[in-house]
């Protein structure tokens, strides 16, 4: 096995650039070879490298393995943080004793976390050295007995002895194993179903997924904060839950909280009403991972923004990870304090675009498979071609198809699909949305959908944006102010200027007229 890897590494070093070899191949290490099953296991030090090597180099490594052993070899990639050390001692533990790396489904996720908890029973959860030990990593208590909306951590024994309020487990709480894992999900508010394993990846979200995996492997180090933005139903919430679930697997006892921005606002209000800001701060400032969804809801709420600013500063200082989502680029969120915007910009900001056709097909096929249904590619392509906006719309359409098939006792076909979705397809054909126009024009001119909302003014971005505004006025019932709002909050006079400019040029420019005709036909189906 080691002889093969030396041979393989030498060949790859000659084939790749020095940077590629050092970045992707050198950190790998062979960990097991099963001659009876013809399988070779290769370890990568983190999930980001594992996924990239698997997608880019697995074919070449498999070919080299086949040539070396004169037999087909199945190359498997596994996660091992010690892979880069290339030490036999780092891989001495039998594979059967290692915890599963990628559990299947929520039940396996809970079971894996329960196993981690059992293995670490009696040991205090690890925490960054500079996190004050005044907050426990155990669980949460309520500000008042009648208030179940603000979950705060329990206090250490010496603080409880001093007369401070302590957390008491609710009815049915279990101290260990599966019950403890369930309790961790209740405290963190994570959805165990949303993992990296069932997140469908395509061009529209591959950068966001890669960044999310890197953050999950190196929380508080790689990109802090991580800011994901994009329209509704594109997978932002799925990705941040996946990060939290991965950290729960990797670090039993991690203090994690997922919260929607509206709930955070509510928590601030209740803490203010009950004069409980000390408890509020103690909780939010002591987390290992804070996941804030839809932060645009902070707009205009100055007290909430102030408290979040202090929490953000404390968490980053303690090397805790902060992850934020929004429906738009940070600088374009109205009503948010400039100092918060600057903090958002200090990390990594990644857009998630609407899914392309192939990705929409993959989403439908994956969802159908999870429902135990064999969906043909023809049906998946038919649905994907007609529904283009977001994942939620696709999943809703699939549910209608499955229900229609079940109620009528018929196999799923394109004909049945047309019947099941006739109302939805009629609406799609009759109504062209501004969002679809933006996506179609962005695809046509090879720019990002996010550029439609941005303040960027290069000609290769400004002109497609003007064309999209023109088409929005021509093909929808939206008013000029409404169109301007959908293009990053622009004034109606900006939209009017774009409409007049493109209309005038269309009458004189045959090439532009042809492009507009193609776009119109595409949008009208």
Swiss-Prot record:
Name of this protein: Chromosomal replication initiator protein DnaA
Organism classification: Bacteria, Pseudomonadati, Pseudomonadota, Betaproteobacteria, Burkholderiales
Biased composition (Low complexity): 169-181
Region named Domain III, AAA+ region: 189-405
Functional note: Plays an essential role in the initiation and regulation of chromosomal replication. ATP-DnaA binds to the origin of replication (oriC) to initiate formation of the DNA replication initiation complex once per cell cycle. Binds the DnaA box (a 9 base pair repeat at the origin) and separates the double-stranded (ds)DNA. Forms a right-handed helical filament on oriC DNA; dsDNA binds to the exterior of the filament while single-stranded (ss)DNA is stabiized in the filament's interior.
Transmembrane segments: none
Subunit details: Oligomerizes as a right-handed, spiral filament on DNA at oriC.
Record family assignment: Belongs to the DnaA family.
UniProt free text on domains: Domain I is involved in oligomerization and binding regulators, domain II is flexibile and of varying length in different bacteria, domain III forms the AAA+ region, while domain IV binds dsDNA.
Protein's gene: dnaA
């Amino acid at each position: 096995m080691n002889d093969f890897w030396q041979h393989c590494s030498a060949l790859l070093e000659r084939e790749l650039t020095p940077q590629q070899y050092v970045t992707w191949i050198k950190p790998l290490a062979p960990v097991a070879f099963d001659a009876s099953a013809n399988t070779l296991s290769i370890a990568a030090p983190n999930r980001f490298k594992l996924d990239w090597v698997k997608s880019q180099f697995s074919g070449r490594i498999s070919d080299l393995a086949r040539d070396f052993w004169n037999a087909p070899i199945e190359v498997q990639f596994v996660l091992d943080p010690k892979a880069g050390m290339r030490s036999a001692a780092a891989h001495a533990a039998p594979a059967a004793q290692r915890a599963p790396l990628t559990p299947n489904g929520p039940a396996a996720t809970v079971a894996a976390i329960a196993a981690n908890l059992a293995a670490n029973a009696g040991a205090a959860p690890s925490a960054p050295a500079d996190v004050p030990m005044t907050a426990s990593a155990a669980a949460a208590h309520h500000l008042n007995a009648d208030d179940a909306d603000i979950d705060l951590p329990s206090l250490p024994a010496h603080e409880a002895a001093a007369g401070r309020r302590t957390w008491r487990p609710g009815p049915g709480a279990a101290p260990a194993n599966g019950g403890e894992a369930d309790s961790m999900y209740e405290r963190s508010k994570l959805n165990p179903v949303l993992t990296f394993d069932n997140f469908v990846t395509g061009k529209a979200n591959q950068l966001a997924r890669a960044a999310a995996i890197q953050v999950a492997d190196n929380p508080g180090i790689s990109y802090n904060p991580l800011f994901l933005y994009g329209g509704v139903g594109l997978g932002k919430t799925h990705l941040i839950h996946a990060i939290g679930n991965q950290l729960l697997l990797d670090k039993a006892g991690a203090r994690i909280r997922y919260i929607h921005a509206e709930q955070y606002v509510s928590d601030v209000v209740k803490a203010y009403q009950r004069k409980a800001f000390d408890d509020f701060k103690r909780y939010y400032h002591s987390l290992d991972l804070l996941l804030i969804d839809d932060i645009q809801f902070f707009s205009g709420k100055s007290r909430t923004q102030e408290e979040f600013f202090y929490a953000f500063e404390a968490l980053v200082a303690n090397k805790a990870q902060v992850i934020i989502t929004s429906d738009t680029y940070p600088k374009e969120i109205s009503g948010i304090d400039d100092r918060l915007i600057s903090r958002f910009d200090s990390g990594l900001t990644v857009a998630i675009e609407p899914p392309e056709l192939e990705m929409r097909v993959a989403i439908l096929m994956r969802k159908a498979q999870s429902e135990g249904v064999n969906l043909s590619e023809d049906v998946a392509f038919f649905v994907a071609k007609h529904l283009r906006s977001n994942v939620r719309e696709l999943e809703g359409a699939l549910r209608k198809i499955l229900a229609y098939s079940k109620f009528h006792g018929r196999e799923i076909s394109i004909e049945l699909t047309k019947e099941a979705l006739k109302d939805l397809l009629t609406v799609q054909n009759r109504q062209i949305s501004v969002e679809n126009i933006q996506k179609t024009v962005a695809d046509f001119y090879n720019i990002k959908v996010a550029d439609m909302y941005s303040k960027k003014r290069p000609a290769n971005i400004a002109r497609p944006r003007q064309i999209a505004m023109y088409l929005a006025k021509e093909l929808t019932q939206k008013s000029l102010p409404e169109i301007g709002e959908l293009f990053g909050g622009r004034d109606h006079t900006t939209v009017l200027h774009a409409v007049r400019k493109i209309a005038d040029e269309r009458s004189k420019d045959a090439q532009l007229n042809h492009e507009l005709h193609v776009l119109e036909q595409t949008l009208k189906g």
